[in-house]
Amino acid sequence: MTAVFRVGLVRLVSRATQSPNLLQAQTNALPAAFQQRCSISGKTMRGGPRVPKAAPYPYKTKKYSVFNAIFDKTSKRFDENSKVICVEGPIAAGKSKFAKELAEELDMEYYPAVDLDLIYINSYGYDMRKLDPQLPPSCRSYDVRNFCLDPSHDLAAQFQIRMYMLRYSQYIDALQHVLSTGQGVVLERSPYSDFVFMEAMFRQGYLSRGARSVYNELRQNTIGELLKPHLVIYLDLPVDAVKKQIKARNVDYEVQSKVFSDAYLSDLEQLYKQQYLKDISTHAELLIYDWTAGGETEVVVEDIERIDFNQFEADIHNKKMLDWRFPLEAEWCEARIKYCHEKPDLMNYFNVPRFDVPELVRSADDGKVWRDVWFNAPGMKYRPGYNADMGDEGLLTKTKIGINQGI
């Protein structure tokens, strides 16, 4: 839809941001909307919290469309900390603690690792897993606990595809935040690294070749719509240390799991280092730390502050930071519209018709039972905010649903 309005949007946005006396000068200069004066800085270097250049746009409650873009520019909120940082590493490496501390020091928004609770616990707090006794086996819940205890189950393929979808959805939310507020984000894992788990599961025989094919087709159909991160931080631990950490944090289903064998953990390490980190480093900056004995977030922040992200702007053919190199303000606005206003369209790219993998297909009879049970559960009959039996009020005066609700 945005393409229809592109010409008019470019003219209107440019007219609102350009001075007539500078038109000639700008023909010889790069009108990049996202030019930085310095590198990322932490609170210690700044001497206090980040001061926004402009008030954040309320993207969670207010739509951002072509018409909003005419009056509300995107790049005016950007500063040196308007970045996407992804924290990666093996299981039990200490990513959550580190990512939280990093986000706090850099004054960025923290996005924790996703899990299936985002699907199984609805907006009213009801756990849909309670419905399992009423559902046929193909429609029952299957989350990380189930995977750890029974990794060869037919629903393992669906589990990993759902994890990728959740990471994809969360990454879109993170892009919404950066483009609408100017505040950077720190994510624990990302859709770009999700494939290492799928490949490790396939190598260990937990996924069929057909399920792997479906996953790869879904990934190929969706991943190109996102903007790659500016920085990836990898916390490295050898396999023996990972196993010790899993035992130390004492999560029952992890300790009892047959999944976290030397072979599976070695596959994860190999896939991370030989494929993911190698590929993502062509675009993003990469920092790798030996986290066997933990580490200090302050040291990492100092290393981040030394990175000159602006050095790649001079060469327009350099692949580094290429996804974030938009020369026109209108292009920034279009990217923001894409992630803020058109998220449902992006999620629809997962609708790839593949019916040749039995474990990813449920029968019509099972599907009917699932619909009848699922959508009669507490809080599931109508959209959130419209369920009178759950205490929602003012139904007669409500005329619209929330932004991104139900996605």
UniProtKB/Swiss-Prot annotation:
Pfam family, one: dNK
Outcome, altering residue 281 to A: Does not rescue the phenotype of Pink1-null mutants which are unable to maintain neurotransmitter release at neuromuscular junctions (NMJ) during high-frequency stimulation (10 Hz). Rescues the climbing deficit of Pink1-null mutants
Gene3D superfamilies in the record: P-loop containing nucleotide triphosphate hydrolases
The keyword Electron transport is assigned to this record: yes
UniProt cross-references to CDD domains, sorted A to Z: NDUO42
Traits of the deletion mutant: RNAi-mediated knockdown leads to loss of ND-30 and reduced mitochondrial membrane respiratory chain NADH dehydrogenase (Complex I) activity. Larvae exhibit elevated reactive oxygen species (ROS) and an up-regulation of Hsp60. RNAi-mediated knockdown in the eye results in retinal degeneration exacerbated with aging and accompanied by high levels of ROS and accumulation of lipid droplets in the glia. RNAi-mediated knockdown in neurons results in lipid droplet accumulation and increased levels of peroxidated lipids.
UniProt cofactor note: Binds 1 FAD per subunit.
Keywords: Cytoplasm, Electron transport, FAD, Flavoprotein, Mitochondrion, Respiratory chain, Transit peptide, Transport
Keyword flag Mitochondrion: yes
Boundaries of the annotated transit peptide in chain numbering: 1-60
Entry comment describing in which tissues the protein is expressed: Expressed in muscles (at protein level).
Gene Ontology biological-process entries: mitochondrial electron transport, NADH to ubiquinone
Similarity comment: Belongs to the complex I NDUFA10 subunit family.
UniProt subunit comment: Complex I is composed of 45 different subunits. This a component of the hydrophobic protein fraction. Forms a complex including sicily, ND-42 and Hsp83; the complex is necessary to chaperone ND-42 in the cytoplasm before mitochondrial import; the interaction between sicily and ND-42 is direct and occurs preferably between the unprocessed forms in the cytoplasm.
Annotated protein name in UniProt: NADH dehydrogenase [ubiquinone] 1 alpha subcomplex subunit 10, mitochondrial
